[in-house]
Amino acid sequence: MQDAITAVINASDVQGKYLDTAAMEKLKAYFATGELRVRAASVISANAANIVKEAVAKSLLYSDITRPGGNMYTTRRYAACIRDLDYYLRYATYAMLAGDPSILDERVLNGLKETYNSLGVPIAATVQAIQAMKEVTASLVGADAGKEMGIYFDYICSGLS
């Protein structure tokens, strides 16, 4: 896992130079949004179960996927879907705090699309649920923090598509 600070420093270090103006601006922007990110993470942590529940209700609950023959029909499949959405929310929150999506590649996306395809998990429905989670989260944390979290939800969706 990498954070925004490490990314900036590593980029300069690889080139064997001091931090330039652009690197310093990236660090300033990261630190300027620190309190916003911490407050958002606190709200998300306190409301994680409800965020997932509302996202499922908005996107999946009354669709064909939950009816007999659908991919979320059995209780076990439904529970696995809820577990996965909670996992995405948690790791998107970590990425938002770090200001860097690398943890999403390392811990979420590597091999996920292939695994879902082999298990018959509908990727379009998963992306739809993640987008619903993005909306629910933004409504709780506010526009600025919601926009920041949206970057990482979108990153997951892109990785699945």
UniProtKB/Swiss-Prot annotation:
Top-level division of the source organism's lineage: Bacteria
Post-translation changes: Contains one covalently linked phycocyanobilin chromophore.
Annotated residues for binding of (2R,3E)-phycocyanobilin: C81
One GO CC term, this protein: plasma membrane-derived thylakoid membrane
Topology within the bilayer: Peripheral membrane protein
NCBIfam families documented for this protein: apcB
Quaternary organization: Heterodimer of an alpha and a beta chain.
Protein's UniProt name: Allophycocyanin beta chain
Taxonomic source organism: Thermosynechococcus vestitus (strain NIES-2133 / IAM M-273 / BP-1)
